[in-house]
Amino acid sequence: GAKNGVHPPLGWIPIQDARIRQHGYNVISAAFPVILPDGTALWEDGMDANVKVATPAEMCQAKAAGATMVMSIGGAAAAIDLSSSSVADKFVSTIVPILKRYNFDGVDIDIEAGLSGSGTFGTLSASQANLVRIIDGILAQMPSNFGLTMAPETAYVTGGSVTYGSIWGAYLPIIKKYADNGRLWWLNMQYYNGAMYGCSGDSYEAGTVKGFVAQTDCLDKGLVIQGTTIRVPYDKQVPGLPAQSGAGGGYMSPSLVGQAWDHYNGSLKGLMTWSINWDGSK
């Protein structure tokens, strides 16, 4: 898996550029649509400074060459007001036509702001409920084979082993819902820009094989929060890593990535990098 960031200073890489596949990327998560305060989603040239988007024909060309195309929603700068169901509904009503027009195969949830847990695992907060509302709203209007992936930061997932509430573990009930019902294609948890947590509140340094293994094993074993087990098996894990040191904290050299990957003897679904643009700019 891979992220295709739209950061203009790094240079534009056409979605159908043959080098993407030549370097091993078979999934492209196009990031990110602009979200207006009322929830309206924008996916167009100039939606952000100097940004271009692939045309529907270019998307089909990339897909014909073997790429799976996913739209990544959120990121550090594209927040959505999760306190409002009307904003959630507006987002769904404007993003679904875009997903259909541009021939996307799935959607990746990478919302990094505004999501907060209630403190009681069995009770969703308003923000969690509205994120579920968005996901369900999208899936209901797309084909049954339309994909769902998620790319949360560690605090929102394994951070729940430290405490459950606020951002800590806030993705866990959402991950559980879609992992258990079979709609989650895979989890792209970000193994960077933060501490790496095990299942017992233990913490590891980002960018290390030890931290990689601790988190990956924790998710496969199952994280227990207030008596509820949330499990993401190895074959639904696609750990996210920085493509180079400038892309984020916790960069792992290719040799370290190889050690971590080989530890699992091919049982992991794959690896994600942030991002194709960062990779191509090196």
UniProtKB/Swiss-Prot annotation:
The active site is at residue 112. InterPro entries: Glyco_hydro18_cat, Glyco_hydro_18_chit_AS, Glycoside_hydrolase_SF, Glycosyl_Hydrlase18_Chitinase. It catalyses: Random endo-hydrolysis of N-acetyl-beta-D-glucosaminide (1->4)-beta-linkages in chitin and chitodextrins. GO terms for cellular component: extracellular region. Its EC number is 3.2.1.14. Its main location: secreted. Keywords: Carbohydrate metabolism, Chitin degradation, Chitin-binding, Glycoprotein, Glycosidase, Hydrolase, Polysaccharide degradation, Secreted, Virulence. The keyword Hydrolase applies. It is found in: Secreted. Pfam families: Glyco_hydro_18 (PF00704). Glycans are attached at residue 265. Residues 1-282 form the GH18 domain. One of its GO terms (biological process) is polysaccharide catabolic process. GO terms for molecular function: chitin binding; endochitinase activity. Secreted chitinase involved in the degradation of chitin, a component of the cell walls of fungi and exoskeletal elements of some animals (including worms and arthropods). Participates in the infection process and directly acts in the penetration process of the host cuticle. Belongs to the glycosyl hydrolase 18 family. Chitinase class V subfamily. PANTHER family: ENDOCHITINASE (PTHR45708:SF49). This is Endochitinase 4. The gene is chi4.
